[in-house]
Amino acid sequence: MDKKASRIRRATRARRKIAELCATRLVVHRTPRHTYAQVIAPNGSEVIAAASTVEKAIREQLGSTSNKAAAEAIGKLIAERAIEKGITNVAFDRSGFQYHGRVAALAESAREAGLKF
């Protein structure tokens, strides 16, 4: 089994557990160049809030879009957008990525900005 298949298997298992809880989830995805975050409704069919380093306003503020500072900025922004929509409690879905580096930085900054998970 290759690296990507293993990550997808881990993500599927975690998403199944989150679906049983019927919780709103904060989904994180990372690529070598960008970091993405979405708050998804419990039914899985609606994106409530989204933020990523692809957004022009974010890219202009940051020197690099693929480091921990960029992930922290995205975490703060996604928390602000979710709280604006009335979402304060979420389940953290790391999409099979290790809770380390950019994923951990995004999670910590979202917690500091007011999201609870």
From Swiss-Prot:
Keywords: Ribonucleoprotein, Ribosomal protein, RNA-binding, rRNA-binding. It comes from the Bacteria. One of its GO terms (biological process) is translation. The keyword Lipid metabolism does not apply. GO terms for cellular component: cytosolic large ribosomal subunit. CDD domains: Ribosomal_L18_L5e. GO terms for molecular function: 5S rRNA binding; structural constituent of ribosome. Pfam families: Ribosomal_L18p. Part of the 50S ribosomal subunit; part of the 5S rRNA/L5/L18/L25 subcomplex. Contacts the 5S and 23S rRNAs. Belongs to the universal ribosomal protein uL18 family. NCBIfam families: L18_bact. This is one of the proteins that bind and probably mediate the attachment of the 5S RNA into the large ribosomal subunit, where it forms part of the central protuberance. This is Large ribosomal subunit protein uL18. It comes from Aliivibrio fischeri (strain ATCC 700601 / ES114) (Vibrio fischeri).
